[in-house]
């Protein structure tokens, strides 16, 4: 109705899309804002091997890349940070399994190298900037690379709703009074500190 269409005259369409075989290559998520600091001039890209579900579930520590947006718009290649993730396993397509997917270990040599090239990092960052410019707000996006064709695809884009709501002129940091052994690492989804007991739930009835 916002576009003036009569709902009783609009016909439904069925879209048939070819599957992006990212299980044969890589996939990931990216943000047109730094999700840790709220810095708006950076694109954050995370990448893993196989289907992107493991990033969503937090099952795999991904590769992480930062690109400076203003310099990218000027035609330069401003990759300002690259970090190799562990990427010990991946999810791939399997027509014989009940869920049509299976888990596979990633070869040691592939774990130790970046899962996408600098050229692919810059292409994804360019798309992130274009998508943000189109929607006029920081965006949260998912992407996939087809292992058969080598092509990159944006498979989802939605507004980023956490850091984009913060005042960009204010940075609040929290720190622990005591330090301990680090048992897990990754990108944060918040800046505050929580505490409590850890309970291992082995069955839904518990």
Language-model features, listed with the residues they occupy:
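Non-catalytic, soluble scaffold/interaction modules
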Residues: 1-206
């Amino acid at each position: 109705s916002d576009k003036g269409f009569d709902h009783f005259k609009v016909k439904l369409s069925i879209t048939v899309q070819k599957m992006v075989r990212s299980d044969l290559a890589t996939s990931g998520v990216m943000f047109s804002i730094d999700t840790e600091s709220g810095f708006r001039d950076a694109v954050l890209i995370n990448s893993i091997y196989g289907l992107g579900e493991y990033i969503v579930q937090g099952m795999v520590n991904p590769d992480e890349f930062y690109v400076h947006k203003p310099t990218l718009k000027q035609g330069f290649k401003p990759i300002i940070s690259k970090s190799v993730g562990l990427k010990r396993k991946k999810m791939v397509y399997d027509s014989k399994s009940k869920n049509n997917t299976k888990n596979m270990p990633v070869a040691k040599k592939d774990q130790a190298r970046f899962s996408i090239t600098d050229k692919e990092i810059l292409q994804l960052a360019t798309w992130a900037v274009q998508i943000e410019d189109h929607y006029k707000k920081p965006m949260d996006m998912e992407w996939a690379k087809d292992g058969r064709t080598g092509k990159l695809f944006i498979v989802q884009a939605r507004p980023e709703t956490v850091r984009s709501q913060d005042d960009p002129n204010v940075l609040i940091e929290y720190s622990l009074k005591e330090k301990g052994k680090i048992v897990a690492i990754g990108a944060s989804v918040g800046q505050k500190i929580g505490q409590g007991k850890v309970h291992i739930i082995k069955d839904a009835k518990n």
